[in-house]
Regions:
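Short, Asp-centered acidic motifs that coordinate Mg2+ and/or phosphate
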Residues: 106, 130, 242
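Conserved catalytic core of nucleotide-sugar-dependent glycosyltransferases
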Residues: 96, 117-216
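A short, glycine-/small-residue-rich helix N-cap motif at loop->alpha-helix starts
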Residues: 86-91
Length: 299
């Protein structure tokens, strides 16, 4: 597991440059400061790769700063950003440790390759132990259209593959809040009591990082399910409720390792193998796409 530096706090001016500082009050009066101290504290937990996030995330973070400064508001937001911790479930555990060391009441996991929408703050209208928005996980091509086939919300279903049924978003067109058995972690708000519950019995690293998120495996080393499925299964078993606000619909950038792309294209080429084109086809494909340790990252 790779450890790297973390940045404890990002301000509006750091996100959008010095121009953002103009819309943040330079002085906060005593009444406003007092009201902020009474607000519910949300820690935004953001695991990054190569210190990169999407532009909509940067915009959301700036909006959080401004939202927390509004007179009469209910929420105040802080940020914990860690960079290049791997694997992702370990990054989440490090963020859980920072959360437990803070006075925050809610942790909001945001994956760095997601694209928040204007409805993001509606998550805090829902009183649930765990509440999430949706974003496309899987896709399929249909004619000239690319459709999301999996929106990261699931119910148990023994008759379906792996025992889970992906719920169709088109069934919820009125912004319904629904109960589910599992959600993806990339846009997930968790109450403090949930993290504290699992931290009590979690194994810990030498720095105190609790193993709350992990990929359970069988003796052969094969994974049983992903870390978010496992976390949700344990949360439901412990009596916590999980909800989805279906009007919070984010985008999702799926990044591909170019070596995987090369293997896919190689297979496609071999399927249509033509002896006469071997020299000009496969060689050019290999030279173009076989990039050692070259991974596509968010820009």
């Amino acid at each position: 597991m790779v450890k790297a530096t973390h940045r404890p706090l990002i301000t509006a001016s750091q996100i959008h440059g010095q121009n953002a500082a103009k819309v943040v009050p330079q002085k906060i009066n005593g009444n406003l400061l007092g009201s902020i101290s009474k607000r519910k504290h949300v820690m935004i937990a953001l695991p990054c790769m190569k210190a990169a996030v999407t532009t909509p995330i940067a915009t959301l973070m700036c909006d959080c700063v401004l939202e927390g400064l509004k007179p009469g508001g209910k929420w105040v937001y802080s940020f914990r950003i860690i960079n290049d911790y791997f694997p992702t479930e370990y990054a989440r555990n490090v963020l859980c440790r920072h959360f437990l060391e803070s006075d925050a009441e809610y942790m909001w996991f945001i994956d760095s390759d997601t694209m928040p929408d204007a409805n993001s703050f509606k998550l805090f209208d829902v009183d649930a132990d765990i509440v999430a928005g949706v974003y496309p996980i899987g896709r399929q091509e249909r004619g000239n259209r690319v459709l999301a086939v999996d929106w990261g919300m699931y119910n148990k279903s023994p008759e379906h593959e792996n025992g889970w049924l992906a719920l169709p978003l088109e069934a919820y067109q009125n912004g319904e809040v629904i109960d589910v058995d599992a959600v993806a972690t990339g846009c997930m708000v968790i109450k403090r009591k949930v993290i504290e519950h699992f931290a009590k019995t979690a194994e810990r690293d030498s720095d105190g990082t609790p193993a709350i998120f992990f990929w359970p495996k069988i003796a052969t080393g094969k994974s049983i399910c992903s870390d978010d499925f496992d976390f949700c299964k344990r949360a439901k078993a412990a009596g916590f409720d999980i909800k989805v606000h279906t009007s919070v619909r984010w985008g999702h950038l799926k990044f591909k390792d170019m070596r995987d792309v090369y293997e896919q294209l190689k297979s496609a080429w071999m399927a249509g193998y033509d002896e006469a084109s071997e020299e000009g086809g496969y060689t050019a494909l290999k030279d173009t796409l076989e990039l050692e340790d070259n991974v596509v990252r968010p820009q």
